[in-house]
Amino acid sequence: ETDVFEALAAVQAEQSIDPNRILVAGFSMGGASTWHLATHHAGLWAAAAPGAGFAETAAYAKVFAPGKEPPTAWEQKLWGWYDATAYARNLSHCPTIAYSGEIDPQKQAADVMTAALAQEGLTLPHLIGPGTAHKYHPEVRQDLTARLEALLDRGRDPRPAKLQVTTRTLRYPGASWLRFEGLAEHWSRADLAGTLRGDTAVDVTTRGTTAVRLVLPGLRQVRIDGQEVALPAPAPEAVLHRQDGVWRAGPPPAGPRKRPGLTGPVNDAFLDRFLFVRPTGKAWHPAVGAWTTAELERARSLWRTLFRGDAPIKDDTAVTAEDLAQSHLILWGDPGANRLLARLLPDLPLQWDARTLTFRGERRDAAHHAPILIYPNPLNPEKYVVLNTGIDFRDHAYGSNSLQTPKLPDHAIVDLREPPGSRWPGRIVSAGFFDEAWR
């Protein structure tokens, strides 16, 4: 999606384009992309037209089929990042028309989205090409084009009077004027519903939400979950947070917290500018040094092969203040080898010396274990620091982008005595998520 938005911005910089008359459409792999962009960024489009593709991982990829290694609990939780079915409610404010060939196996995508939308009380217009496999039926395509042109003529409403939004992560914090600013628990469902009352008042209801941002210039009155909240002088936007069960005006109290742009899991760092930082020193243990060197090269190769770019990389002695300000730092090695990691270690949530790696009270032999971790950078809490991983799917997922979902949560400990394979970088002996305060 980063590529999509950068390409869109480049076109908009050169052409005069009405932002309220942009639609998203695609077929097959482009259909999968459209399901994602429509549900996760619903407030941007005048309409969406996904054709074929896939809309979720489990059923489409048959991950629970006999003989397959079952996904871990954290993998299943992280399907909530990309599954369009988990974000179906957002299509309530994005007119969407699906297309499928009648005999196309990828009709499955529209079928599962129809079911997901029905659970939200919504219906999905679904055009079907009779007797058609994996392509557009010419006459049905003409019908689809006419419908989309009518929706473009109407255009997107930049300030809808009513909004319903849902998310599992603050990576996708809402739409238009109604936005999540804090969640009760990442990867559990959170909902917002809002109704404007004239130009200066709004009613909001929440679920699984601890902070809300209302981008409504001139707003004076807020009723949230039935509670009236007094606002200070009108401003371009208002932030409210819940504390001790009571909604209050203003941002949440200062301190580490998951928020838009800082949510985890480890793959989240690669949706923005990042920098691989390789060690220049000697690892405490040969096994750790060999493993981190191999994993760094694998990460660089994957980035070139799948994402068609060269991952930026610097030595640990060459990182600048500008790098700290602009990039998520991906640190490779152990504190004996990587000087920047050694510098940051006192402010990271683990203890690591030449003998022992300790994380969350569990002590492990540092000769045979290494951490994978994402955490706010102590030198710049607006950015991440990541330890010892690139994009975390491996060879097993290369055959289908439906499998290229996050494989690891916020942190993991790897036993290096099991060599890396097609699914894992070694034996994962523990893995989990930090809470909303990065604890």
Could you tell me what each predicted segment is?
Residues 1-28, 39-45, 90:
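Gly/Ser-rich "nucleophile elbow"/oxyanion-hole loop immediately N-terminal to the catalytic nucleophile
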Residues 189-228:
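Beta-strand-rich binding/interaction modules
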Residues 24-26, 51, 99:
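Short beta-strand immediately N-terminal to the catalytic nucleophile in serine-hydrolase-like folds
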Residues 215-439:
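Solvent-exposed alpha-helical segments and adjacent loops
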Residues 46-88, 93-94:
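Mobile cap/lid helix-loop segments that gate and shape the active-site cleft of serine hydrolases
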Residues 33-37:
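Hydrolases whose catalytic domains are alpha/beta-hydrolase-1, hotdog thioesterase
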Residues 97-104, 130-131, 206-208:
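Conserved strand-to-loop "acid loop" that flanks and positions the catalytic carboxylate
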